[in-house]
């Protein structure tokens, strides 16, 4: 796996950042947060950054969008063209180009309706890859780096090395693909790739699938100049069968070009000193922290109809999926509720998991609240109002909630996977600098042991607990630092992505 080598440039880079979703416009998960925050941080460093995304029917800000290009995507050897417009959206200093192609994006949701993925998702996001490069030529934006994200953009590196291999316009353009979640590989039948007929001859086939299927993610990993994961530990996990979900050979082939960079946290949104959603703002000093947490606990208890008593409160805000480890928590939750504690879980998802949580909440309504919805204000109130935040994840490429928890003096209880391992310091290993609790074994019993350990700390060592809260609030994961590491990846290492670009600019 590649090691980070600091390398700076005084010459601004032109960076095209392509994502299927961007916070503020369209969002289903953490990818959107990265697609907003990382380009903004790179722009702040002086680089010329442009974002490309689809112009969804439900996109926010569409009323203020301005059409800056009306054109067609022409495909050599194909008897058709796809008409589209480039709509510029207002997002501060970073231009956002949204691809308006109604046949692909004029739908009620981004990827699926009623838990059923759109049947033509392969073609929809093949278009995103092809049109992103097409618009660069037509707008005259000649990128030094094209930063791709997950399978939705995985065909851009392929196109650069095939269709545009002899292009003067893209001659010095290099590509990066960031892996936010390798479980989603973008596997579709050949008939969805008519916009990129070159792909069919290359046959980047998922070996576990029918031979008539191609994986966009595999193509992206194979052809990108650099590959990175959203945490150092997740980068290591991608080299294993379990961590890569069967793509270990693909990542092992790119090990020398594989980087791990932790996501930043948006402290403009998640800051107990300024949070508009919580009952009482607070700082890290002991008096402010104690008063603020107590007021926020009382407010949370009111909101979820739990008794307003002084007991440790445990929280969880997540999609109800096995990835988030609910199948480890549910079997031991009732045992844990025998203690003098309260638990709050907020989320929607798997009907079976939701039903199990509803049953437990009905039987233990004085100790357990299950809120089967998602509300951003309530999520803030949970982070501020609970004492411990549970993340018993099956896998977690980076994770954001543990960072939010640390900012609010809420101690995370996490499994030692992905970015959770990179961002939380375990009390049982290094108590002086600890910020939470970590465990390894993916079993309900191992989780219960850590829950009981955290309860002992709270009840028997209150001063130690308060010290850990202050340790947690001192942790910072700033996007500026993450952006510096991304720039180092663009510029650093023996095979710098853009060293020849910088040299050309120096010569000029």
UniProtKB/Swiss-Prot annotation:
GO terms for molecular function: alpha-1,4-glucan glucosyltransferase (ADP-glucose donor) activity; alpha-1,4-glucan glucosyltransferase (UDP-glucose donor) activity. The keyword Transmembrane helix does not apply. One of its GO terms (cellular component) is cytosol. Disulfide bonds: none annotated. CDD domains: GT5_Glycogen_synthase_DULL1-like. Its EC number is 2.4.1.21. The keyword Transferase applies. ADP-alpha-D-glucose binds at residue 27. Gene3D superfamilies: Glycogen Phosphorylase B. It catalyses: [(1->4)-alpha-D-glucosyl](n) + ADP-alpha-D-glucose = [(1->4)-alpha-D-glucosyl](n+1) + ADP + H(+). One of its GO terms (biological process) is glycogen biosynthetic process. Pathway: Glycan biosynthesis; glycogen biosynthesis. It holds the Pfam family Glyco_transf_5. Keywords: Glycogen biosynthesis, Glycosyltransferase, Transferase. Synthesizes alpha-1,4-glucan chains using ADP-glucose. Belongs to the glycosyltransferase 1 family. Bacterial/plant glycogen synthase subfamily. This is Glycogen synthase. It comes from Photobacterium profundum (strain SS9). The lineage of its organism: Bacteria, Pseudomonadati, Pseudomonadota, Gammaproteobacteria, Vibrionales.
């Amino acid at each position: 796996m590649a090691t980070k080598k600091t390398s700076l440039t005084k010459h601004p880079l032109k960076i095209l950042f392509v994502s299927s979703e961007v916070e503020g416009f369209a969002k289903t998960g953490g990818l959107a947060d990265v697609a907003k925050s990382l380009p903004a941080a790179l722009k702040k460093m002086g680089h010329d950054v442009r974002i490309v995304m689809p112009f969804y029917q439900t996109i926010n800000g569409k009323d203020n969008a301005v059409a800056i290009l009306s054109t067609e995507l022409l495909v050599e050897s194909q008897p058709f063209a796809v008409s589209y417009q480039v709509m510029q959206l207002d997002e501060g200093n970073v231009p956002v180009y949204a691809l308006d192609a109604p046949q692909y994006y004029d739908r009620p949701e981004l990827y699926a309706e009623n838990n059923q993925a759109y049947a033509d998702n392969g073609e929809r996001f093949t278009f995103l890859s092809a049109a992103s490069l097409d618009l660069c030529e037509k707008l005259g934006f000649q990128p030094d780096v094209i930063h791709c994200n997950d399978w939705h953009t995985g065909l851009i590196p392929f196109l650069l090395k095939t269709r545009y291999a002899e292009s003067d316009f893209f001659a010095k353009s290099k590509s990066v693909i960031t892996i936010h979640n390798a479980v989603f590989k973008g596997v579709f039948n050949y008939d969805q790739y008519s916009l990129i007929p070159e792909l069919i001859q290359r046959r980047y086939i998922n070996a576990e699938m029918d031979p008539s299927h191609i994986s966009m993610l595999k193509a992206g990993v194979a052809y990108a100049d650099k590959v990175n994961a959203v945490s150092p530990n997740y980068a290591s996990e991608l080299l294993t069968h379990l961590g890569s979900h069967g793509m270990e050979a693909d990542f092992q082939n790119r090990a020398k070009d594989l980087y791990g960079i932790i996501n930043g946290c948006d402290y403009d949104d998640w800051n107990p000193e300024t949070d508009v959603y919580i009952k009482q703002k607070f700082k890290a000093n002991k008096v402010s922290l104690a008063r603020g947490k107590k007021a926020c606990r009382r407010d949370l208890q009111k909101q979820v109809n739990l008794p307003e008593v002084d007991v440790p409160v445990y929280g969880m805000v997540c999609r109800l999926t096995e990835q988030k480890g609910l199948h480890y928590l549910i079997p031991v939750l009732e045992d844990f509720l025998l203690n003098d504690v309260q638990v709050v879980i907020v989320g929607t998802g798997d009907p079976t998991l939701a039903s199990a949580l509803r049953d437990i909440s009905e039987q233990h309504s004085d100790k357990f609240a299950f809120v089967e919805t998602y509300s951003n204000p309530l999520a803030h109130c949970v982070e501020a109002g609970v004492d411990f935040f549970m993340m018993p994840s099956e896998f977690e490429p980076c994770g954001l909630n543990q960072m939010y928890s640390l900012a609010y003096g809420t101690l995370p209880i996490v499994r030692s996977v992905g970015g959770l391992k990179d961002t939380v310091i375990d009390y049982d290993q290094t108590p002086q600098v600890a910020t939470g609790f970590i465990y390894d074994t993916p079993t309900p019993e191992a989780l219960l042991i850590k829950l009981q350990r955290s309860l002992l700390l709270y009840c028997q060592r209150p001063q130690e607990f308060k010290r850990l809260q202050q340790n947690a609030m001192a942790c910072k994961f700033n996007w500026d630092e993450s952006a510096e590491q991304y720039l180092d990846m663009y510029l650093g290492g023996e095979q710098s992505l853009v060293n020849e670009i910088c040299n050309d600019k120096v010569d000029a």
